[in-house]
Amino acid sequence: MREETAEQPAPLRSGLTTGSCATATSLAAARLLLSGQISDAVEIVLPKGKQVQMRLEFCRLVDNFAEAGTLKDAGDDPDVTHGALVFARVRLEMAPGVRFVAGAGVGSVTRPGLVLAVGEPAINPVPRRMMTEHLLQLAEELGYSGGFEVTIGVEGGEALALKTMNPRLGILGGLSILGTSGIVRPFSCAAYIASIHQGIDVATTNGYRHIAACTGNASEDTMRRVYNIPDIALIEMGDFVGAVLKHLRKVPVDKLSLCGGFGKISKLAAGHMDLHSRHSSIDLPQLALWAADTGADADLQQRIRDANTSQQALAMCATAGVPLGDEVCRHALAFARSVVPAQVQVEVFAIDRQGGIVGQAGVALSKEHT
């Protein structure tokens, strides 16, 4: 009998950023204006020198401008913009250089703290540089000495932006045109971590010295209930608590509140900075040891080790009057304090699935908030 072999998973496919889409479409539109050449595909050079060809959905003259569009292909990454139509409209200007405008579906910056000034279209520096380099090279090749007005838009971008961090960052009216390498890596954490850093930067630049970093919607609701904290000071960290703690070394605040589900906080207590199940797991034997430190007898400790979930362990401790939630938060607090600067006051909240506080540490509040 032939021995069975496990089927190897197909490699995940990379995609291209909205910045690459904007570069390709602006180049095609400018070429049409300057040479009359209508393209159905265009080749661009990414920041690290790789050449890629991108297919266009359209490339046409309209009155005194040209426009081109392409469908964003994020590869196998679950990107909110995958399949969206990214388009550029280019007009020629007398003055040399490139001027950027936010079109329909692209946001504008309304708060200080980002790399772009207030009032600027949300087209990030690397995409701006990519477009500028391609357009100036085209102008040189064709002997054109004037400049370009480049309007970038994303069809349906205003609605898509509501699924991103843009509204909280003060980027209103649509999406951001992003990318540092020009390539979307499947399931890369880089973009999410960047949004966490931006959230902290925006909050501190706008004068907020107390921020609350939360793992999800329920923990955000808890922080609103406890502190009436505004959205600008709520940092949606998801599983990336390490991104918050490490960034505070560069941008310290006066006070940091960490809030998450009990299971997530127990991982932080064990020293994990990525709380996703792919990278860290709940240590039930460790929970049993912490329960012992707060009065759990041998039988309860064994039942914790044998529990199916951390929530089950927490419930057993609650029945026995053992404050496991507070003990876990104390260990999470100690770990967080070991990462951030000493001047940052840290507190930790653990919540249940209903948003009730089941543990807290470093908190100058009474239990009335639970």
From Swiss-Prot:
- Give the Gene Ontology MF terms in alphabetical order: cobalt-precorrin-5B C1-methyltransferase activity
Q: Identify the stretch annotated as signal peptide in this record.
A: none
- For this protein, the parts annotated as crossing the membrane are none
What are the alphabetically sorted keywords of the record? Cobalamin biosynthesis, Methyltransferase, S-adenosyl-L-methionine, Transferase
Functional pathway: Cofactor biosynthesis; adenosylcobalamin biosynthesis; cob(II)yrinate a,c-diamide from sirohydrochlorin (anaerobic route): step 6/10
Q: Enzyme group, top EC level?
A: transferase
Q: What biological-process GO terms show up in the record?
A: anaerobic cobalamin biosynthetic process; methylation
Task: Extract the SUPFAM superfamilies matched here.
Answer: CbiD-like
State the EC number(s).
2.1.1.195
Instruction: Name the reaction it catalyses.
Output: Co-precorrin-5B + S-adenosyl-L-methionine = Co-precorrin-6A + S-adenosyl-L-homocysteine
Top-level taxon of the source organism = Bacteria
Supply the InterPro entries for this chain. CbiD, CbiD_sf
Q: Which family does it belong to?
A: Belongs to the CbiD family.
Write the protein's name: Cobalt-precorrin-5B C(1)-methyltransferase
Q: What organism is this sequence from?
A: Pseudomonas savastanoi pv. phaseolicola (strain 1448A / Race 6) (Pseudomonas syringae pv. phaseolicola (strain 1448A / Race 6))
State the encoding gene.
cbiD
